[in-house]
Curated annotation (Swiss-Prot):
It is found in: Cell inner membrane. PANTHER family: POTASSIUM-TRANSPORTING ATPASE A CHAIN, POTASSIUM-TRANSPORTING ATPASE POTASSIUM-BINDING SUBUNIT. It comes from Shigella sonnei (strain Ss046). GO terms for cellular component: plasma membrane. It is a multi-pass membrane protein. Its main location: membrane. This is Potassium-transporting ATPase potassium-binding subunit.
């Protein structure tokens, strides 16, 4: 079993790196504001039609463009969900959503979280899924990538005030990266057996003679961007464990690759744009080390079996509870770590049914800020915050002004970095405390004791860090939970983007200083270790007390 697990992890990472390297070169061209071959004429036409200017923007203008697009998308999606019964492509005549569920869902998909307090096949029409959720899957992913484009330019430019044009970046990211790659993935899913139609739900007779209603819909097109954009919201309630979404072992492997593809490619692009590929490799090494350790821990925990089931006399040589027999323990463990290391949230197994230790690792990966590969764009700018913090700590230890890639890291940048890092832990801990203090929060818990608290902690961690996966056992479709999680998702997304853009605006105005003998190398194994230690230290200090009340207490009981 250990050899199989090692081979699975090694194969996954090898194929991932092979695919991400050329994509990273393409992204580097876009960051450097170089149109891809054959696209310049199309871009000029598309900008001329709505009269959009392609002038360079400072960080405030860039930020306002990103926020404006997302707020408009939030309003449109909210009213679309409220009135979906008036809209076309609703063969099941599904009613509109309640205001709190519509708000929660709109915020969820605009913030790239895709938390779902509903069952897709019984709640949303084809139009809502396709014109509402899928469109936001593209736009939220493009927004995250655009932010990291601007942040990377802050290190490659000097004595300037501009970071590019948000509309140009959003257009290029969507048209030349997300749409083509998602189209290829969708066609592959269709070839493998995923659904893509607009038929009414089909009544069929089962082998037992009973009648069953099979949901239909444009699944493959949404499934592709759901994975590629690290969105994670399933067309069906069972998400990627549903055979209509994820029909074969091959589609399952491709889904995992799609989740990590752009975050990995952005690391390669970062190294290429900065002129030092070692910087990109340093980030990949740090992410990969944490990732491999976490996968190993989850695999080990799940292979050991569930002692609670064993005490009841059930066969628990390995923990198959809540897992698809098509995929098994090892693949389910790998998928769980992939989807929570990235801010995806798609699932092929019930994380609530993992062992206490096996479920704690995905929760902790979210709590450290989704920086181990992370979401498209958001993962890299989240990890870059820890890079700046690690550089600052190293500067304090050696008595030098911290600098990274020739840019001095001053008090302003460190205040903004600390603010950005503290946003999501504050939301998680305060949100979980509020839920446990109120009757409305506790009434949604279906399980008592440490595991019940773990479900609450997981839900708030998932929302605040824009992941979207969940422990079951929490009845989250209530006004209290819909509003609480919507607030966490909104602030967890934009409360980090705003200081990140402010840091970029500060750094781009500075001159690059040449490296000297006293400059801390930020590309070697020493800095990789320092960066990993910084991530672990912040995560440990922040969440150990909360984890001790939940999964740790459950593991020791």
């Amino acid at each position: 079993m250990a050899a199989q697990g090692f081979l699975l992890i090694a194969t996954f990472l090898l194929v991932l790196m092979v695919l991400a390297r050329p994509l990273g070169s393409g992204l580097a061209r876009l960051i450097n504001d170089i149109p891809l071959p054959g696209t310049a004429g199309v871009e000029r036409i598309l900008f001329r039609l709505p009269g959009v200017s392609d002038h360079e923007m400072n960080w405030k203008q860039y930020l306002c463009a990103i926020l404006g697009l997302n707020m408009l998308g939030l309003a449109v999606l909210f009213f679309m969900l409220l009135g979906q019964h008036y809209l076309p492509l609703n063969p099941q005549q599904l009613p509109g959503l309640s205001w709190d569920l519509a708000l929660n869902t709109a915020v969820s998909f605009v913030t790239n979280t895709n938390w779902q307090s509903y069952s897709g096949e019984t709640t949303l029409s084809y139009f809502s899924q396709m014109a509402g959720l899928t469109v936001q899957n593209f736009l939220s992913a493009a927004s995250g990538i655009a932010v990291i484009f601007a942040f990377i330019r802050a290190f490659t430019r000097q004595s300037m005030s501009t970071l590019g044009n948000a509309w140009v970046d959003l257009l290029r990211i969507t048209l030349w990266v997300l749409v083509p790659v998602a189209l290829l993935i969708a066609l592959f899913f269709i070839q493998q057996g995923a659904l893509q139609n607009f038929l009414p739900y089909q009544a069929v007779n089962t082998v037992e003679g009973a009648q069953q209603l099979l949901p239909m819909g444009p699944v493959a097109s949404q499934e592709a961007i759901k994975m590629l954009g690290t969105n994670g919201g399933g067309f069906f309630n069972a998400n990627s464990s549903h055979p209509f979404e994820n029909p074969t072992a091959l589609t399952n492997f491709v889904q995992m690759l799609a989740i990590f593809l752009i975050p990995t490619a952005l690391c390669f692009a970062f190294g290429e744009v900065t002129g030092d590929r070692r910087q990109g490799r340093m980030l990949l090494w740090a992410m990969s080390v944490i990732f491999v350790i976490c996968v190993g821990v989850v695999m080990w925990a799940e292979v050991q079996g569930n002692p609670h089931l064993l005490a009841l006399g059930a066969d628990s040589s390995i923990n198959m509870e809540g897992k698809e027999s098509r995929f098994g323990v090892l693949v389910s463990s790998l998928f769980a770590v992939v989807t929570t290391a990235a801010s995806c949230g798609a699932v092929i197994a019930m994380h609530d049914s993992f062992t206490a230790l096996g479920g704690m690792v995905p929760m902790w990966l979210m709590q450290i800020g989704e920086v181990v590969f992370g979401g498209v764009g958001s993962g890299l700018y989240g990890m870059m915050l820890f890079v700046l913090l690690a550089v600052f700590i190293a500067g304090l230890m050696i008595g030098r002004t911290p600098e990274y890639l020739g840019k001095k890291i001053d008090v302003r940048e460190m205040k903004l970095t600390a603010l950005a890092i503290l946003v999501t832990p504050t939301l998680v801990l305060m949100g979980a405390a509020l839920a446990m203090m109120t009757d409305a929060g506790r009434s949604a818990m279906l399980n008592p004791g440490p595991h019940g608290f773990s479900e609450v902690l997981y839900a708030v961690s998932s929302a605040a860090n824009n992941n979207g996966s969940a422990f079951a056992g929490l009845s989250a479709n209530s006004p209290f939970w819909n509003c609480l999680l919507a607030f966490c998702m909104f602030v967890g997304r934009f409360g980090v983007i705003i200081p990140v853009m402010a840091i970029a605006g500060s750094l781009v105005s500075k001159k690059s200083q040449p490296a000297s003998s006293g400059t801390l190398p930020t590309h070697g194994p020493l800095f990789v270790g320092l960066l990993i230690g910084t991530v672990l230290l912040v995560g440990a200090l922040t969440f150990i007390p909360a984890l001790a009340l939940g999964p740790v207490a459950e593991y020791l009981s």
